[in-house]
Amino acid sequence: MPSWWCCCCLVVLLYAQRMIVPSSAQNDGSDELQECPGGFCSPKYLCPNGTYNEANAQNQEIIMLRFGEEDVCQDYMQVCCSNATSMRYELVTNNEPVEYGCGISNPGGLIYQVEGNRTYAQYGEFPWVVAILEAFYSSNEQQFTYVGGGTLIHPRFVVTAAHIFNKTENLVASFGEWDMNRDENVYPKQNIDIDRTIIVHPEYNSVGLLNDIALAQLKQNVVYDKHIRPICLPNPTDRFDDQLCISTGWGIEALTSAYANVLKRVDLPVIARASCKKLFAETRLGPFFRLHKSVLCAGGEEGADMCDGDGGSGLACPNESGAYVLAGIVSWGLSCHQQNVPGAYVNVARFVTWINATIEGIL
């Protein structure tokens, strides 16, 4: 193996970390609602007359739901509702027709709104986003450790980065996830066990993170809905140079240096290979750095980057029809949010033939 790859492995920051997230058991509706002046704290979607004002919490960069100028509801996704005496948390039964085509986003989100701040995705905005979790039991209660991100491409398959899998037992794919601190959602999450056999690309190199791609096969099909839909795969010849794309995840945030609870979104330009090689050569990787053919570069703008905990998350680019295509998968980087230091993504177009052949061979 060339010596520069040994150097590279010492400085590369893997975009995969672990954190504990709450159990995904749904609220049974029996909890009492918190009182507030003139009513009760209630989810916005259940309250027709609650007040919703934008306020930016300086330290957390979270958009809060407020009653007038005072925070009266402890949960930032609730408002003070004057007629909520008999209301309880409930899930929406979706009777509207759902478009099942790939790459269809919900630009305004579904029900919840995080207004005036593009740091966070709207609820249900990117239906293909998947949280990969590891299940365990503590005090006889099921809990989850966050492993990394993934992208839904088929009712039975999630594509992600190979490097996030330290172990392959008790893994769960969580669909429809948005706020890691909330169990209640307007549309129900679907948690589906992942088969123990993670399908890693045969040429994956864990030292240099070459061909850093894997398929996670679900033990049962996920059910598509408004908030759960697949992304489109690119054609093998597709290029995304200079296109502005979107990456999402629950990794470290730029302003807080803490894990995101609400799904963050980062708008990132795709960088042409020649420019990317030049930028990396000006870093501590040095002038002899060679950019592997499996890597796509994006970012390089200060304060806009994916970071620890985002490994396996997708980079989605809109095509001419407005549908989103999976251009990249978060793989590695030298630092987070630094000017002129791009992030390294798996170039998905190079692996489309392998993805399709693998799925067809199994099914």
Swiss-Prot record:
The keyword Glycoprotein applies. Residues 33-82 form the Clip domain. It comes from the Eukaryota. Residues 114-360 form the Peptidase S1 domain. One of its GO terms (biological process) is positive regulation of protein processing. Disulfide bonds join C36-C80, C41-C73, C47-C81, C245-C317, C276-C297, C307-C336. The record marks R66, F67 as: Cleavage. The keyword Secreted applies. One of its GO terms (cellular component) is extracellular space. Induction: By Gram-positive and Gram-negative bacteria-mediated infection. By parasite P.berghei infection. Its main location: secreted. PANTHER family: LP15124P-RELATED, SERINE PROTEASE-RELATED. This is Inactive CLIP domain-containing serine protease A8. It comes from Anopheles gambiae.
